[in-house]
Amino acid sequence: MNTFFMFGKYTSESIKEISASRTKQAVDVIKNLGGEVNAMHILMGEYDLLFCVNLPGNEEAIKASVELTRLTGIMFNTCPGIAVEIFDRLVKK
């Protein structure tokens, strides 16, 4: 499994439909792609939301981003994350 950080921005339309049931639907999108949600946070600043998810790969991350935007109207910027331990191993001299 790979870790992805999904930064979301509300639109004027998507904010009208905020609900706990839509949050559950968003979690179901990730699960249906073979993933899991590690954390969901509301942010103050450039982005409104941050989802930390595990997904099998890049293709599932792309599908998740598109499906969540279709479901919610929220625009997502999805970035892969690499554990520091893996990074340290990769750059070891």
How would you label these PLM feature ranges?
Residues G8, H41, P80:
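A cross-domain feature marking catalytic cores of carbohydrate-active enzymes
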Residues L55-I82:
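An amphipathic, aromatic/His-enriched active-site/gating alpha helix that lines ligand/cofactor pockets
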Residues G8-Y10, F51-P56:
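Short beta-strand-to-loop capping motifs
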Residues M1-Q25, K31, E36, Y47, ...:
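Short S/T/G/P-rich N-terminal loop/turn motif that feeds into the first structured element of a domain
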Residues G34-H41, F76-N77:
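A short linear hydrophobic-aromatic micro-motif
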Residues D28-V29, E67:
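Generic structural signal for isolated residues within well-ordered alpha-helices
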Residues I42-N54:
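Amphipathic, hydrophobic secondary-structure cores in small proteins
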Residues Q25-A26, A64:
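Hydrophobic alpha-helical segments typical of transmembrane helices
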